[in-house]
Amino acid sequence: MLQDFKAFINKGNVVDLAVAVIIGAAFGKIVSSLTDDLIMPLIGYFTGGLDFSSHFIRLGEIPANFTGSVTSYADLKNAGVPLIGFGQFITVAVNFLLIAFVVFLVVRAVQRFNKAEEAKPAEPAEDVVLLREILAELKKKG
């Protein structure tokens, strides 16, 4: 059973998948930072200071012992107030679109690379080259 597991792990697809998952997780953090720290603040700047991440609709009552800000999504959420955080959803949707676009670009580049590899004609084997040279010499002589 251990040998079967070792053979399974050593297959290229499993190792490739593991590497892809690790790189994907790291890439997700990069895209989240890009969205949260660059894109959304720029959108906020051009829309007059609009901060999407703090937009929400409160669905329930605020507890009597609540000490946070009634305009803070994080404070209300931590207090257990039911909320619809549509601003946070917009941020996550932008993250998804960025990741999907980059994955599309990578897949497209790989497909183009594979087409270029397929388009190259295969070089003839050495024996075929030798036979062609012999045939050419024989045609010259006779």
Curated annotation (Swiss-Prot):
The chain crosses the membrane at residues 14-34, 86-106. GO terms for cellular component: plasma membrane. GO terms for molecular function: mechanosensitive monoatomic ion channel activity. Keywords: Cell inner membrane, Cell membrane, Ion channel, Ion transport, Membrane, Transmembrane, Transmembrane helix, Transport. HAMAP family: MscL. PANTHER family: LARGE-CONDUCTANCE MECHANOSENSITIVE CHANNEL, MECHANOSENSITIVE CHANNEL MSCL. Channel that opens in response to stretch forces in the membrane lipid bilayer. May participate in the regulation of osmotic pressure changes within the cell. Belongs to the MscL family. Homopentamer. This is Large-conductance mechanosensitive channel. It comes from Rhizorhabdus wittichii (strain DSM 6014 / CCUG 31198 / JCM 15750 / NBRC 105917 / EY 4224 / RW1) (Sphingomonas wittichii).
